[in-house]
């Protein structure tokens, strides 16, 4: 509603025994002209996929993150099992089941089921190492398509600049030590998952664990001075505001402080658990958020 004009189609639902239903924007549209990045990963599901799909179909936003989202494109309703018992039977403890009755369909006619929403720019997300998503589920419903909405118009601007956005992002990712480490760790986790075996030899396991900890410690040590320099540069280049549910209605957003960050800090009692968590991201911007900021800058530069 904030990103589209009034009465724009957002998503269809359609089922075997139910008519097509349309869901449209109410047209508040306070940020219709600003460049938008939608960050997604393989855990982004259902409503977040509907949002990402609509923004992509209208050419309103660049989708950034994992190769695709989760792929949960079905609608369920609860059915009480007591309704199926004999009239005078006890209904105590009958419970209920969720029955799939419809699918979601994007404006372009594609279902979000199974395939999800594909990213325009793929980044090395931590979730990429995990075998998750609707496609990994047993008996998942298939992907399908219906006729696209005949009256929607996609803004062609993002499609024109997308090749250049991808080129610039790829150059930055190739030179970003944090994102390259993420790519290494994704490949490592995939190898371990595909191998699907663990040695029963205690010494072998100890050597494997020690090598992984060595790599993690070396990565942490490399990051500390680099992150300190990045934080100083951020202080010169950025003004970072705090935005929480308490601040949404405020006339002016407060400046973010270190105290705000400390509220969300994680603590680890085990020194080994502290690996990779004891080096704070500069300005609370992880590598994915930082690259997303660069992409937004590119979008503004190419307008």
Describe each model-derived feature in a short phrase:
Residues 1, 53, 290-298:
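A broad, structural surface signal
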């Amino acid at each position: 509603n904030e990103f589209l004009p009034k009465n724009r189609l957002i998503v269809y639902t359609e089922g075997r025994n139910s008519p097509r239903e349309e869901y449209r924007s109410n047209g508040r549209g306070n940020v219709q002209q600003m460049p938008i990045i939608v960050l997604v990963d393989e855990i982004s599901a259902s409503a977040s996929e509907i949002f990402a799909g609509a923004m992509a179909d209208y050419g309103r936003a660049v989708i950034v993150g994992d190769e695709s989202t989760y792929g949960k494109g079905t609608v369920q309703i609860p059915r009480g099992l007591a309704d199926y018992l004999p009239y005078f039977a006890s209904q105590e403890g009958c419970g209920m089941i969720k029955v799939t009755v419809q699918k979601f369909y994007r404006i372009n006619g594609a279902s979000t089921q199974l395939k999800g929403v594909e990213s325009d720019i793929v980044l090395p997300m931590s979730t990429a190492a995990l075998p998750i998503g609707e496609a990994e589920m047993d008996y998942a419903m298939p992907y399908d398509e219906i006729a696209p909405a005949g009256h929607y118009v996609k803004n062609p601007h993002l499609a024109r600049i997308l090749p250049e956005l991808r080129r610039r992002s790829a150059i930055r990712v190739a030179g970003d030590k944090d994102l390259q480490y993420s790519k290494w760790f994704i490949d490592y986790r995939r190898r371990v998952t595909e191998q699907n075996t663990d040695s029963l030899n205690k010494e072998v396991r100890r050597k494997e664990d020690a090598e992984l900890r060595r790599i993690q410690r070396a990565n942490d040590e490399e990051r500390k001075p680099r992150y300190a320099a990045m934080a100083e540069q951020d202080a010169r280049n950025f003004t970072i505001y705090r935005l929480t549910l308490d601040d949404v209605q405020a006339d002016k957003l407060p400046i973010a402080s270190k105290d705000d960050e400390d509220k969300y800090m994680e603590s680890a009692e085990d020194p080994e658990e502290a690996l990779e968590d004891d080096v704070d991201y500069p300005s609370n911007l992880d590598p994915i958020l930082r690259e997303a900021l660069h992409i937004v800058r590119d979008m503004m530069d190419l307008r």
